[in-house]
């Protein structure tokens, strides 16, 4: 799968594209591009979506700029050519070598604070990996797309990322990661309070939780990442003032969004990417 570069002329250069076919919708050709300055505002919006209610805890402009400072690493997906807004983005940030940059200090502090509330074991492990003398290199995977984007566009992005990181390593750039930390989002389905109020009470019978707090995925591929993860944290957003009826997706249920952090070894991540290509083949 080839990727278009900023300097390529759209009128004369054709890239490989991914055609997603769905019998219920029109066919769409998705093109892959390097991150470039024109993507700044779209990146900010995608990062805001990724961080959910906690997006105010991180300087999104600085984070978008940092990602754009690595133009040969990572991908965007567009449908209307190079000058259009990306529908998806993927990049990776070295949390060790960039530890002194203000936005990474801010982001790392936020991540640690959320782990302290949800998984102290993973909190301690990550802090050890990020110590200056740990000998480890942790790559933070930043992946987000518009809600209705087909998952089939994602595996090629990861496959290209592996290739780009290897090229960077060959040039002695700091992308030889020992671990990857995936930042993502999940949700649980919860019963509507409105339905509780409307439903007549029944003596001697307690209401049962609608989903048993089953974790659901905004990103389907996260299910495969969880299978190979060293550790997992599903954490509540710090700024969440939650009303289940503001996020109702079914007649009798709402959704409760939450953050997700997955820690993986380099080997497990690299081995999983080809499997994602098979599972979600277009």
Swiss-Prot record:
Keywords: Endoplasmic reticulum, Nucleus, Protein transport, Transport. Involved in nuclear export, actin cytoskeleton organization and vesicular transport. This is Protein bcp1. InterPro entries: BCP1_family (IPR025602). GO terms for cellular component: cytoplasm; endoplasmic reticulum; nuclear envelope; nucleus. It comes from Schizosaccharomyces pombe (strain 972 / ATCC 24843) (Fission yeast). Its main location: endoplasmic reticulum. Belongs to the BCP1 family. GO terms for biological process: protein export from nucleus; ribosomal large subunit export from nucleus. The gene is bcp1.
């Amino acid at each position: 799968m080839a990727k278009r570069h900023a300097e390529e002329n759209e009128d004369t250069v054709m890239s490989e594209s991914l055609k997603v076919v769905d019998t219920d919708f029109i066919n769409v050709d998705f093109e892959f591009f390097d991150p470039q300055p024109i993507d700044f505002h779209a990146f900010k919006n995608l990062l805001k979506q990724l961080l959910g209610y906690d997006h105010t805890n991180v300087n999104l402009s600085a984070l978008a700029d940092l990602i754009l400072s690595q133009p040969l690493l990572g991908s965007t997906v567009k449908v209307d050519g190079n000058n259009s807004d990306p529908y998806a983005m993927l990049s990776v940030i070295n949390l060790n070598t960039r530890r002194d940059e203000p936005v990474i200090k801010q982001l790392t502090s936020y991540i640690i604070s959320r782990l302290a509330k949800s998984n102290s074991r993973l909190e301690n492990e990550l802090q050890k990996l990020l110590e200056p003398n740990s000998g480890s290199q942790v790559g933070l995977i930043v992946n987000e797309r518009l809600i209705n984007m087909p998952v089939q566009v994602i595996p090629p992005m990861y496959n290209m990322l592996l290739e780009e990181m290897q090229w960077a390593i060959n040039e002695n750039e700091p992308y030889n990661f020992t671990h990857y930390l995936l930042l993502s989002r999940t949700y649980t389905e919860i019963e509507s309070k409105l339905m509780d109020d409307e439903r007549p009470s029944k003596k001697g019978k307690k209401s049962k939780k609608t989903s048993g707090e089953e974790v659901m995925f905004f990103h389907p591929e996260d299910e495969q990442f969880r299978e190979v993860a060293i550790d997992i944290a599903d954490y509540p957003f710090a700024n969440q003032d939650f009303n289940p009826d503001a996020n109702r997706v079914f007649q009798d249920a709402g959704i409760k969004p939450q953050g997700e952090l997955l820690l993986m070894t380099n080997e497990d991540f690299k081995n999983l990417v080809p499997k994602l290509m098979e599972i979600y083949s277009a």
